Amino acid sequence: MLAEYLLLPLLASYASAVTISVAKSGGNVTTGLQYGAMEEEINHCGEGGLYAELIRNRAFQGSTTYPSNLDAWSAVGGSTLSLQNLSNPLSSALPTSVRITGKGTSGISNTGFWGIDVRPQKYSGSFYVKGSYKGSFTASLQASNGEVFASTQVSSKSVANDWVQHEFTLTPKKKASSSNNTFVLTFDASKASGGSLDFNLISLFPPTWNNRPNGMRRDLMQALQDLGPKFLRFPGGNNLEGQTIEGRWKWNETIGPLTQRPGRATTWGYEETSGMGLVEYMEWCDDLGMEPLAVWAGLALNGDVVPEAELDVYVQDALDELEFLTGSVDTKYGALRAKYGHPKPWTIRYVEVGNEDNLSSGLSSYKSYRFQAFYDAITKKYPNIQVLASTIDMTLPGNAGGDYHLYDIPDNFITKFGMFDSYSDAHPILLGEIAATEYNNGVGIDWSNTHFSLYPWWLGSVAEAVFLLGAERNADKIIGTTYAPFLMNLDSYEWSPTMISFNSNPDDTAKSTSWHVYNNHMTNTLPATSNDTFGPPLLCHRCETAKTNSHIFKAAVYNSTADVPVSLTFEGVGRGTTADLTILTAPSDVSMNAVGGANVVQSQTTKIKAGKQGVFSFKLPNLSVAVLTTN
């Protein structure tokens, strides 16, 4: 039998001694989802990041917002490239292709997402071709100086009036010295009818997490697995909403074969392929043991709102999505899920309706009819699903929960430690986007003139730790918390800071100072008592099993004037009990983990022993995050 409790003490702005006594019973039980991840297509975190596809602009997808183009592509061998919208395209979803015309060796090269990582491993690729051609294709990975790391011949199956897929593998013999590499695809144009061929959906994947086809980048998934998130909030974020109602994220256009996914204009300045679609998100949840999700709520970022009389079709779309995810194979959309390789339904316990509907002039319609329409329909058909509003700025019906977002300066995170103390547990809150983004300035964030840090920095991360302890202290009211945004490609980003930063070289991936703070947190809470009055009530973690009897204490020290002496006792723990005390610090308050740089977070673990009356005595330095675990 397993019983879990949680204690998370806050130590802030004091240097006097602190005495803490931890009780055995009482406290608040969490949802078990206390910390999670948030993903939306921003910062090329999916396209060019977590989604392992190496070819940028692989299918020339475009929209009225971002028209089709030849970004990342260059002609090879003096050939010419031209975009085509043929009468018989690869598919209606992918109508635009590239025509390569030349004489002799001709082709196309791609620079990837600002580089392609090359190392001794198998790369799996494919491309579609239309046109009469009796020769062969050459696919290769090359350095910018022309050095060839791997090359293979692909016999042509191309015909005049149809699109034919060709597959290949590449296995370099050595690792490239940098990621300044290209993928090159060539053919002998003299053997092609009219000296030209049409190409589309040119793809190349490295080995993926769990070797899933169309899968995820291994180093980023490893960083996420090491963090251990318990839920995934997706697909946004603003990207869920779209700039217009028609431009919203449509779940049914992100499933099925890649040839049937049209892609869409993100709200962050570029087109996405939808290669990382609903099923891939759910497989991500499966692989890391996380829970989902969000649905669209009838609001676009441009302020357009679906009128009440027209909302039913969008509510039905949300129900169809839930049927696709959870329905039996006897249902219409459950059968479609099975067709796409997942006969076993997924379990959905939470659905968030929309994103930040208190913004973009959306709150009035959200309160008056939009949220209620989704809430009523979902709870009627799926009574075991908890429906969350995308704001807490409204009166919530039934058992609905809310979502609260906080981007702020570190000092304001400290002042918000107790903000949930008086909040009702009848409507639990998801802290769906949380981050210290800007240095202390005595005021807060001016959203018309922001000065966000490139990376999380140590002072901000410690301030986040303080706020998180306040959230865990109210664990009966808080469903879970996630940093946001989570990922950033340093070569092309729209928002910083993020939990994890990266470029095309997996060796350069940086787990931020905030990653290290979040990595320390637990799940269930138990009150503690203290004879000191330095701040809010203290909390502790205790875990009992048939084989172990352990306790965990956690603390964050923010802006103290000197080391803080701590005397800690756990009820039932006596003299001589040993514990491991791990203290996280950094060289300075502005220390940060940069892409390609060393980890600045210093972790020191020491063994300590309880003295008389079971007292653990130790000191915590300023700007530290600590964990004590009894043995």
Curated annotation (Swiss-Prot):
Gene Ontology terms, cellular component aspect?
Answer: extracellular region
Where does it live in the cell?
A: Secreted
* pH-activity dependence text: Optimum pH is 5.5.
| Pathway(s) served | Glycan metabolism; L-arabinan degradation
Parts of the chain that traverse the membrane: none
* InterPro entries the record matches: Alpha-L-AF_C, ASD1_cat, Galactose-bd-like_sf, Glyco_hydro_b, Glycoside_hydrolase_SF, Glycosyl_Hydrolase_51
EC category name: hydrolase
Supply one GO BP term. arabinan catabolic process
Catalytic activity, EC: 3.2.1.55
> Can you provide one Gene Ontology molecular function annotated for this UniProt record?
alpha-L-arabinofuranosidase activity
- Reaction(s) the record says it catalyses: Hydrolysis of terminal non-reducing alpha-L-arabinofuranoside residues in alpha-L-arabinosides
How would you summarize the temperature dependence of activity?
Optimum temperature is 67 degrees Celsius. 50 perscent maximal activity is exhibited at 75 degrees Celsius. Reaction time was 10 min.
This molecule's function is given as: Secreted alpha-L-arabinofuranosidase that actively hydrolyzes p-NP-alpha-L-arabinofuranoside. Exhibits significant activity against polymeric arabinose-containing substrates such as arabinan and arabinoxylan. Also hydrolyzes low-molecular-weight and polymeric galactoside-containing substrates such as galactan, xyloglycan, and p-NP-beta-D-galactopyranoside.
Q: Would you identify the family this protein belongs to, as annotated?
A: Belongs to the glycosyl hydrolase 51 family.
The molecule here is called Alpha-L-arabinofuranosidase A
